[in-house]
Amino acid sequence: MIFPTKFDVIVVGGGHAGTEAALASARMGQSTLLLSHNIETLGQMSCNPSIGGIGKGHLVKEVDAMGGAMAIATDEAGIQFRILNSSKGPAVRATRAQADRILYKQAIRSRLENQPNLWLFQQAVDDLLVEGDRVIGAVTQVGIKFYARAVVLTAGTFLDGKIHVGLNNYSAGRAGDPPAISLSARLKELKLPQGRLKTGTPPRIDGRSIDFSVMQEQPGDLDPIPVFSVMGSVAMHPKQMPCWITHTNEKTHDLIRSGLDRSPMYTGVIEGVGPRYCPSIEDKIHRFAGKDSHQIFLEPEGLTTNEFYPNGISTSLPFDIQLALVQSMRGLEHAHILRPGYAIEYDYFDPRGLKSTLETKVIQGLFFAGQINGTTGYEEAAAQGMLAGINAALQTQERDAWTPRRDEAYLGVMVDDLITKGVLEPYRMFTSRAEYRLSLREDNADMRLTEIGRQLGCVGDAQWAVFETKREAVARELERLRSTWVSPRILAEAEAERVLGKGIEREYALADLLRRPNVSYETLMSLKGVDGQDLAGPGVAEDAVREQVEIQLKYAGYIDRQAKEVERHDYYENLKLPQEFDYMEVKGLSFEVRQKLCKHKPETLGQASRISGVTPAAISLLLVHLKKGGFKEFAALPPTSEAAA
């Protein structure tokens, strides 16, 4: 057999973005090559041993809805599961899991090795093959050339990466891995706009040296135990473990302050900007100087190791300060550090240089995903990787590209934010970033995206069957509740008060009763008639169906109102702008606005409206110019005042 060197799609990098990109492309039937500097680190969790959280869990569910691997791998590796914001509304509830690092890597690698159309090869990439304005392949560190019609680059923190511990630093992609210096230099040659960012990680602690008896235990949810994937189950979960909570104190803070003169962040050695929402412990005591204490979570790294991850003390301070600050906390007085914490600086490329498909604007066929685009977090990377893999595959199939809108998915919100606003610091997803979050819930990710995933070719038969069964069950139950009526004649007042909180004065459909804020699906199903017969139950047994039915009915008014709002803005939001248009010709626009529009070349009117400094008045002027300019898409538009609104 001849060794293959020609593929439809090449994916460079085997982290969370790269693995999802490669799997998505291969699921869609394209011959795909995944190049990684080390096959042993495919799917490695480089920082915290957890998946999900507010906003992040929503992204994982969306990746899962389209056939991705992160959620199901977490179900197979998760050693603690919790629903965050469980007492709040469904829009902001989020799943979070602690994962066994080894089991997670095994789950990801197993899927990669067993995925048809996917080849793995262990080699770092030093160069890209570019002809004119199109990428045609990649060159490895030993000069092996691979050719493809699309290349997805997911380099993580490896591009010219530099690790800092105190005032000492060295080149690395992460601890124990070499940096991608040649590839970084090559990308700079291609004139892609770039900058430097920074992230960090805490020291790891030997659990045998921790006194858990003086700490607060934090168990996972037990009733019910959450599941991440629509294809997952509680039976998949390995043994469950608790986390533990301790706190910093004044002594801790004094020790940190005493080391700031040797901090690479506070002495100007590090130039890259760090993540605002995952600050180092140095940043915390500086930014929140009035706070006496910070909560620290001791998270187990896995079932077969004593290593613990102290979430909340990411640091690049010198090792002697790291040791002292760890040992200043309750329960950690005799702690042994297994690995020092560090900060890492790396190159990223301005995501405003990308199309909404994550293809670069200047080089056809070259896609970027993950931290190279200025994001932070496994979940953000995985979602981008999946999208880039899908669009790389679609391009090689000569099919139309696909990107979800802001009202369709958190993935759509993230990509739109990145390509219109760019980043000044590592971008993290939150539910607050989404205007339509009531419609973008974890529980309906499959209802929003699985059908389109099936049409694209990245959702398999088994998952499609599960989805169809759920969708049909939800529709049947909604119809039953809307067509089943209860009257005062067959419902005793005492029973009505027990289930509904008060008697009923007329006939009601079960759907109307379930809309009441104090009535749950479970209690409604227990409703009995005067003769003891079931008036509502037994209902459906599947938790996912019950949850979907209850949310759809209880929030119907809000969801319908949001849908109408989306419809109102949809036309202008998705109105395609001519890519050859010269914005410098638009009279009335400020020079700054014209410059920004020329630089970013927005694909739609919605994207243009979200570019920093582009006002509603500027959008109205632009529309007037386009209507007068003979662009047929704009000729029949209503008055511009409606667009500005």
Curated annotation (Swiss-Prot):
Reported cofactor(s): FAD
Keyword match Amino-acid biosynthesis: no
Gene Ontology cellular-component terms listed: cytosol
Keywords: Cytoplasm, FAD, Flavoprotein, NAD, tRNA processing
GO biological process, one term: tRNA wobble uridine modification
Subunit structure: Homodimer. Heterotetramer of two MnmE and two MnmG subunits.
NCBIfam families assigned: mnmG_gidA
Family: Belongs to the MnmG family.
Entry keyword Flavoprotein: yes
Intracellular or extracellular location(s): Cytoplasm
Function summary: NAD-binding protein involved in the addition of a carboxymethylaminomethyl (cmnm) group at the wobble position (U34) of certain tRNAs, forming tRNA-cmnm(5)s(2)U34.
InterPro entries according to UniProt: FAD/NAD-bd_sf, GIDA_C_N, MnmG, MnmG-rel, MnmG-rel_CS, MnmG_C, MnmG_C_subdom, MnmG_C_subdom_sf
GO molecular function: flavin adenine dinucleotide binding
HAMAP family membership: MnmG_GidA
Record: residues binding FAD: 13-18
Name this polypeptide is given: tRNA uridine 5-carboxymethylaminomethyl modification enzyme MnmG
UniProt: NAD(+) binding residues: 274-288
Source species: Janthinobacterium sp. (strain Marseille)
Pfam families in the record: GIDA, GIDA_C_1st, SAM_GIDA_C
